[in-house]
Amino acid sequence: MTIKSDRWIRHMAQEHGMIEPFEPGQVRDTPEGQRVISYGTSSYGYDVRCGKDFKIFTDINSAVVDPKNFDAASFVDVHGDVCIIPPNSFALAYTLEYFRIPRNVLTICLGKSTYARCGIIVNVTPLEPEWEGRVTLEFSNTTPLPAKIHANEGVAQMLFFESDEPCEVSYADRGGKYMGQDGVTLPRS
């Protein structure tokens, strides 16, 4: 597998709709001149933004978290330009960008150093060949203090790896349960 460059990312986004909306360069400031956490195309990846809808874990119902029988009441919905994650807690968000992953590509998501250096960890499982949708982002606040996530700014980086041959069975072929997700998507069993 080979990691793909900015040229390949731009070509696939602009000619094949792999990322929408797409930013061909790296954005560091708003049109008004305000600094933002960078997003857009980088040397060997694409920095994604998160939307304004968040789900924050709460212990109001004192439920046990079970991925096979998940209780949506374990979350509080938040909509806004920022999300404050309580100490040692967790939140979900989604990317503004919609992805269409080619059949011979696997995409890995890593957190941005700006957040990692503040104790905020981003976790996303790989975007498999022929998966498409908005990515549900998982944020963990590992600190003893509240942590802030900024909507419409960079939160994670996608790296694209191209195989030397297409996979035998893609995510679309097997009817993956998160295909076409749009917005924050909770666990499905």
UniProtKB/Swiss-Prot annotation:
<dbReference type="GO" id="GO:0015949">
    <property type="term" value="P:nucleobase-containing small molecule interconversion"/>
</dbReference>
<dbReference type="GO" id="GO:0006226">
    <property type="term" value="P:dUMP biosynthetic process"/>
</dbReference>
<feature type="active site" description="Proton donor/acceptor">
    <location>
        <position position="138"/>
    </location>
</feature>
<comment type="subunit">
    <text>Homotrimer.</text>
</comment>
<feature type="binding site">
    <location>
        <position position="171"/>
    </location>
    <ligand>
        <name>dCTP</name>
    </ligand>
</feature>
<dbReference type="InterPro" id="IPR011962">
    <property type="entry name" value="dCTP_deaminase"/>
</dbReference>
<comment type="pathway">
    <text>Pyrimidine metabolism; dUMP biosynthesis; dUMP from dCTP (dUTP route): step 1/2.</text>
</comment>
<dbReference type="InterPro" id="IPR036157">
    <property type="entry name" value="dUTPase-like_sf"/>
</dbReference>
<comment type="function">
    <text>Catalyzes the deamination of dCTP to dUTP.</text>
</comment>
<dbReference type="Pfam" id="PF22769">
    <property type="entry name" value="DCD"/>
</dbReference>
<keyword id="KW-0378">Hydrolase</keyword>
<dbReference type="GO" id="GO:0008829">
    <property type="term" value="F:dCTP deaminase activity"/>
</dbReference>
<keyword id="KW-0546">Nucleotide metabolism</keyword>
<dbReference type="GO" id="GO:0006229">
    <property type="term" value="P:dUTP biosynthetic process"/>
</dbReference>
<feature type="binding site">
    <location>
        <begin position="136"/>
        <end position="138"/>
    </location>
    <ligand>
        <name>dCTP</name>
    </ligand>
</feature>
<feature type="binding site">
    <location>
        <position position="181"/>
    </location>
    <ligand>
        <name>dCTP</name>
    </ligand>
</feature>
<keyword id="KW-0547">Nucleotide-binding</keyword>
<feature type="binding site">
    <location>
        <position position="157"/>
    </location>
    <ligand>
        <name>dCTP</name>
    </ligand>
</feature>
<dbReference type="GO" id="GO:0000166">
    <property type="term" value="F:nucleotide binding"/>
</dbReference>
<comment type="similarity">
    <text>Belongs to the dCTP deaminase family.</text>
</comment>
<dbReference type="InterPro" id="IPR033704">
    <property type="entry name" value="dUTPase_trimeric"/>
</dbReference>
<feature type="binding site">
    <location>
        <begin position="112"/>
        <end position="117"/>
    </location>
    <ligand>
        <name>dCTP</name>
    </ligand>
</feature>
<protein>
    <recommendedName>
        <fullName>dCTP deaminase</fullName>
        <ecNumber>3.5.4.13</ecNumber>
    </recommendedName>
</protein>
